[in-house]
Amino acid sequence: MKRKVLVLGAGIQGCCIALELANRGFKVDLIEQDSVPFNRSSIRNEGKIHLGLVYINDTGFETPKLMLKAALRFAPYLSRWIGIGVKDLNVGTPFYYLVSNQSFLDTEQLEQRYHQLEKLYCESTEKESFTYLGYKPDKLVQKSSEENLAKHFNTDCLQGGFYTSELAIDTSKLAEHIRKAVKKHSNITFLGNHRILGISKNGSGYIVEGEKNRSNWKKKSLQVVNATWTDKFKLDETLGISTPKEILHRLKYRVIADIPEEMKNFPSATMVIGKFGDVVIRPDKTAYLSWYPDACRGWSNSIEPPESWNEPSRGIVPKKDFDEISEKLIRETEKWYPAIRNCTPKIVDAGIIVAHGKTDVDNKKSRLHQRSKIGVTSYGGYHSVETGKLTTAPMFAMDTADRAEKIYRQL
């Protein structure tokens, strides 16, 4: 069948691609190793829809440009597939960007670069009608006074800070809506618990092979999309596609906690630039928090992450690890955000981050400060997607669908 596509991986990227292809009339088999869609790294993160602020150390400015472009398209594209407003995604309060005393860019340097991003934002919104999560902020960033910062943060840790328009969504809410959309679409067949082992060329098409419940399975199609995130490079290699240098997988833990009523309108915050952390305050009186030095507990330059990372990335964490990790992350976070001491942890889990680099984020020259060489690469009817960030997934889904349409017209 010409209008049939196999989409491998049912995280946010694979689901968005499947939904867009299905809307265009393609029949899609959405193949996933887990029992349900959207149950691994896509859900186990802070949900930030990046405006480019955290990647401001990219001296070529390519990453901030890409993130801003993707952020302005995130909600409009998502609404094509799940048909809801942003308010249904439990959006957190706007972020303060707090400049640590240990930041390798000082407040003045950051202000100059944020001004450059602000200019780019103004140019973008003049040319296009896209909004940021349903809003059209007058400004992305404003420098904050020390008096204002001191209302919520320990300014002894800081050299300055900025109030921003950046927001985070609740990934668990997004997962609920994505799963419903996938389940009800008549053009999508979800194949869960299907481990994918390899891909091979088959005439003008492809064969995807794998395992389910100790039995082998095989699927054929003229077009295949690799949106597997952690297995992307391994599967690319089975087709003879060379693996890029300096692949890096990191395992980063997070805590979701209950907060008291009086905190529900407190600001969200990101500390920059280096090995620091984030807090997201949500309207349902929960908070996301992470502190990188204690949260990043896995580092691998192998082509795929270690098998031992599988359970925490599915939300399975032993009680002793739950207690130890939550205690550490809360203790370290309350040093700069004192009210966090009043929270009660309810979830501890981890997401796998796929990037490129040898050195960590506290190195000014680390490749981790760049995330622009990502997106879709096509080899005939095989489309391999390096998502990069949650923010960019809907935009790359549209690109992938456009490529699939083009290939279909050539068949």
What are these regions (language model features)?
Residues 3-30:
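N-terminal Rossmann-like FAD-binding beta1-loop-alpha1 element of flavoenzymes
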Residues 23-43:
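Glycine-rich FAD pyrophosphate-binding loop
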Residues 38, 213-272, 282-285, 304:
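Central helical "cap/lid" subdomain
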Residues 47-146:
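Dinucleotide-binding Rossmann-like beta1-alpha1 core, especially the glycine-rich loop
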Residues 101-180, 185, 201, 365-368:
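Flavin (FAD/FMN) cofactor-binding and adjacent substrate-gating region
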Residues 117-121, 285, 296-354:
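Flavin-binding catalytic cores
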Residues 159-165, 331-411:
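C-terminal catalytic lobe of FAD-dependent flavoproteins
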Residues 160-223, 227-236, 393-401:
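Helical element adjacent to the flavin cofactor pocket in flavoenzyme catalytic cores
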